[in-house]
């Protein structure tokens, strides 16, 4: 999450066409998650990111996991991905998210979205 926080602290503007001049990552939601996960620049798209992940249960979400509408069928345009930060409430209905949106990089509280958003964990991460 430390890498994700760096973009929140120095908010990057949003762009699907341009890359960050320092890191080389695309300045959209999937480029941001790719950067946080240390995938190769310029980063994967929301269509490709699920190939790097395993689907997990909502109750198993840990900081740095993804909440995503991605994979085949999203064509990249309708897809979106955000990083899970922490639960806001005991009922697990809202969470802190780190994400790249049209106004730039933000950390904000979001209600846990329903389908088509699903929780994912990067394959190289293990709980514990």
For each predicted feature, which ranges?
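Extracytoplasmic low-complexity repetitive segments enriched in small/polar residues
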Residues: 1, 5-7, 96-99, 109-110
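N-terminal capping segments
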Residues: 1-37
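...with weaker cross-activation on analogous glycine-rich loops/strands in unrelated enzymes
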Residues: 41-106
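Catalytic cores and adjacent binding grooves of peptidoglycan-active enzymes
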Residues: 104, 110-113
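Low-complexity, Gly/Ser/Thr/Pro-rich intrinsically disordered linker/tail segments
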Residues: 113-128
């Amino acid at each position: 999450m430390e890498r994700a926080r760096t973009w929140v602290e120095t908010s990057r503007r949003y762009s699907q066409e341009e890359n960050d001049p320092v890191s080389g990552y695309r300045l959209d939601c999937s480029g941001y998650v790719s950067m946080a996960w240390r995938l190769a620049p310029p980063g994967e798209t929301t269509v490709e990111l699920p190939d790097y992940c395993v689907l997990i249960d909502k109750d198993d979400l840990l900081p740095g996991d993804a909440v995503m509408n991605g994979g085949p069928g999203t064509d990249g345009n309708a897809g979106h991905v955000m990083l899970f930060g922490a639960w806001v409430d005991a009922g697990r209905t809202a969470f802190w998210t780190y994400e790249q949106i049209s106004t730039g990089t933000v950390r904000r509280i979001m209600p846990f979205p329903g389908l088509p958003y699903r929780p994912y964990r990067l394959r190289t991460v293990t709980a514990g």
